[in-house]
């Protein structure tokens, strides 16, 4: 039994609140256990200069934590005057993952801005951001469809992400909280589509190694969790699902 009473391959409690904010075209508050992230999607009727004239759209992301998302207050990056390497890595990861399932030609020359703001962190903030951002993005696309600016919702598949790891005395576990993540021998983030295709796998041994058999076990656990997350995304999206499938 894990520190929070879960089974080894059991997700934390997940809740996706749709249309959480008033102004964005799409928004959600995603709760993954005690990790909470507000994800919003904004549609801009233009593309970056390097995309002009190509007839395709673009998806990009920004990620941030409020100062007391963590146990000890962290200084806002805006106060420091620069974005940290960790934040830049996560922003690129979110944008890259979402672009993998967006039909950029069907989107047209528009930019989707994804903003992920962590209001409480207890492990898995980047994976929660990706899972929530996908729903926010689809909600924004539904607005485009209703306005007859696109002929279909421009996504090719579902997308979700979770963490897996190897924790001493537990073995392979799914969806690590901060207490588990901080002592894990192996930590891995996995992003997959609804068709079971991998978008990205980030795995690291923390002063430890892992075998091919353990890698397979980690990926099996992640796949199980991601398919459950996609079912929750579908439930949150409701009737919009009929425009995707």
From Swiss-Prot:
- State the species of origin: Bacillus cereus (strain G9842)
Instruction: Enumerate the residues binding phosphate.
Output: 86, 124-126
Known Gene3D superfamilies for this protein? GHMP Kinase, N-terminal domain
Q: Which family does it belong to?
A: Belongs to the RNase PH family.
One GO BP annotation is:
rRNA catabolic process
Q: What PROSITE patterns does the database record attribute to this sequence?
A: RIBONUCLEASE_PH
Q: Does the keyword Lipid biosynthesis apply?
A: no
| Name this protein carries in UniProt | Ribonuclease PH
UniProt keyword annotation of Nucleotidyltransferase present: yes
Catalyzed reactions:
tRNA(n+1) + phosphate = tRNA(n) + a ribonucleoside 5'-diphosphate
Known partners and oligomeric status: Homohexameric ring arranged as a trimer of dimers.
